[in-house]
Amino acid sequence: MLINKKFIVGYHRLRGCDIGENCKISKSAIIDRAHPKGVHIGDNTRVLIEAMILAHDYSRGALEGYSMWCDTYIGKNCVIGGRAMIMPGVKIGDHVYVAGGAVVSRSVPDHCIVAGNPARIVRKGTVISDKGQIVEKGERV
């Protein structure tokens, strides 16, 4: 299923990713190629240009000859900004906006905006529409 020339979802579903309805994923976004079945994306979520979502980690077990395989969850009505990186095993709640370039290495609760490297919560109480727009900004943390 090709949404348009800039967004592709069906390809990732064929690879085994669990992707909800009305999602848009940039063609340049990278969804884990080694363990695509470990990536779960909720309805109405946007994954923007060159964002990366991982569900495996070779570095932790490289010396012992094994890799870590885990599931990475992204909730409903989320936006993953350009060049953001979601690390393996992270759970991102619903209505979360991940700023461009953020590196998310810990789970994030619902209704937040996260930014930075490592990512931290900068706003709570946000609401994101099903079109990926921030409806309520919430309060600064």
Task: Go through the PLM ranges and name each one.
Residues 82-106, 112:
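Beta-rich strand-turn-strand
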Residues 21, 43, 76, 94-95, ...:
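Short acidic capping loops at alpha-helix termini that bridge into adjacent secondary structure
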Residues 1-21:
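Membrane-anchoring hydrophobic helices of lipid-metabolizing enzymes
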Residues 109-110, 124:
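Conserved beta-to-alpha transition
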